[in-house]
Every structure is written in structure tokens, then in C-alpha cells.
């Protein structure tokens, strides 16, 4: 049988506090030996080492993302397909556990530039793995398909977004968001606008990834 570990996805602070969810939301996407990334829209480029004459110190995992220049690629024309991912799904009590193989299609659907300045956008394997340089903001759309088909599938999972500080914000929408969680000393403000949930850091402090700057979601999508 499949020996892959059932990996819970949560944010753990130095006090070992974490997001706790029922079993049906407890697992996240994982790579398999067959996982590969294909550019389905746009022209990719190498991860940049400089921007506007300044050296960039990208983290090693960011360099592995798929990078695009906004000067050569526009919104709705940047897309990657991540083939052969897998996620463990089960009922709330842990019964009926099984692995689901999926393809994930990630599309940049909006780009807001800063003073018409071009920059870079990068996408990774996970639904929150994204980086931008030199632009104001962007919107990423994630769609799951049954592996090797064009049949959309709905999955239950959870995600935690960390290090939202220094006037940053994040907006999240899904087919169904079943829970949202922050720490009891959160520094974030909240706004719901239509089907999007926004969390905003209304301060100039860099908290370096503390739990108070994190928000967790359980969702179906």
C-alpha cells in the first residue's frame, strides 16, 4: 500500500500552538515522484538576481518557483499546470481515508503595477506559493482537476498564511471557506468584500513570522 505520511498542515509558534481542525480538513497537497510543472500560458524566465540595479537575495525555495516578467506577460496569460499531486481525504472522524491524485492549474488573473513599473511574478507548487517583485499586487486563481483529465474536483484542506505585517494584506476566496482562525493576540484587521476575505496589517512593524501575523483557513475548493 501507499506508505506516504499523512502530513497535517498547521502553523506552530514557539509555544507549540497550532491550528486544530477535524480530520477531513487535516491534510495538504504533496508532491509525488511523477509531479512536474508545465507552463501552459506565458513565457517563463530565470529567477532574477537584481532588480532596478539592486541585488536580490531570494530564498533558495523561491528560486525553484516558475518566474515570469510582467513586461512580457499579462494578466490571464500567465499560467502553470502542476501535474500528479496527491492529497489524503477522509471523513470528519477519519474514516474512508483515501488518496486523491490531482493536477493543479494556477493562473495570474490580475496584476496591479506600481507607477506603471514592470517587475516579476513567480509561482510554486502549493496554492499559496507565490512571489512578486516590483509590482503592487496580483491575484492567483487555483483550480484542481482529477489527474490527467479536464474534470474539476473539490478537495478539503487547510492553509495557514504567515508573516502578514508592515502594511501587507492578503485576500482569500474559495468555493466554501468553512473556518478562519487567528491567534488571540492577532495584529491583523479583517474585511469581507463579496466572496473575498481580507486580512490587513495596519502597522509598520516587522514581526518576523510571529503567530500574531498569521491566519489559517479550512476550505473546500
Show which residues each predicted segment covers.
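A general structural signal for short secondary-structure junctions and capping/turn motifs
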Residues: 71, 150-152, 217
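A mature extracytoplasmic/lumenal domain signature
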Residues: 84, 144, 163-165
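Extended, low-complexity, turn-rich repeat/linker tracts enriched in Gly/Pro/Ser/Thr and Asp/Glu
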Residues: 90, 132, 149-150, 162-173
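Residues within well-ordered beta-strands of beta-sheet-rich folds
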Residues: 141-143, 156-162
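Contiguous ligand/interfacial binding patches
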Residues: 6-9, 13, 17-21, 25-29, ...
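N-terminal targeting leaders for non-cytosolic proteins
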Residues: 1-130
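Short beta-strands within extracellular/lumenal beta-sheet-rich domains
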Residues: 132-149, 211-215
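Extended extracellular/luminal ectodomain segments enriched in beta-structured repeat modules
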Residues: 75-77, 148-158
Amino acid at each position: 500500500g501507499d506508505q506516504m505520511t499523512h502530513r497535517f498542515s498547521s502553523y506552530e509558534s514557539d509555544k507549540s500552538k497550532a491550528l486544530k481542525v477535524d480530520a477531513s480538513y487535516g491534510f495538504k497537497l504533496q508532491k509525488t515522484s511523477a509531479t512536474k510543472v508545465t507552463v501552459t500560458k506565458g513565457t517563463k524566465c530565470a529567477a532574477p538576481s537584481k532588480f532596478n540595479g539592486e541585488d536580490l537575495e531570494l530564498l533558495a525555495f523561491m528560486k525553484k518557483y516558475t518566474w515570469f516578467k510582467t513586461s512580457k506577460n499579462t494578466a490571464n496569460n500567465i499560467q502553470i499546470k502542476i501535474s500528479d499531486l496527491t492529497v489524503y481525504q477522509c471523513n470528519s472522524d477519519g474514516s474512508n481515508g483515501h488518496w486523491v491524485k490531482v493536477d493543479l492549474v494556477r493562473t495570474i488573473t490580475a496584476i496591479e503595477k506600481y507607477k506603471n513599473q514592470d517587475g516579476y511574478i513567480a509561482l510554486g507548487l502549493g496554492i499559496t506559493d507565490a512571489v512578486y517583485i516590483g509590482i503592487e499586487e496580483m491575484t492567483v486563481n487555483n483550480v484542481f482537476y482529477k489527474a490527467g483529465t479536464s474534470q474539476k474536483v473539490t478537495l478539503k484542506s487547510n492553509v495557514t498564511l504567515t508573516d502578514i505585517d508592515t502594511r501587507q494584506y492578503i485576500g482569500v476566496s474559495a468555493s466554501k471557506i468553512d473556518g478562519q482562525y487567528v491567534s488571540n493576540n492577532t495584529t491583523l484587521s479583517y474585511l469581507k468584500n463579496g466572496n473575498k476575505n481580507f486580512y490587513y496589517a495596519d502597522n509598520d512593524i516587522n514581526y518576523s513570522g510571529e503567530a500574531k501575523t498569521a491566519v489559517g483557513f479550512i476550505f473546500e475548493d
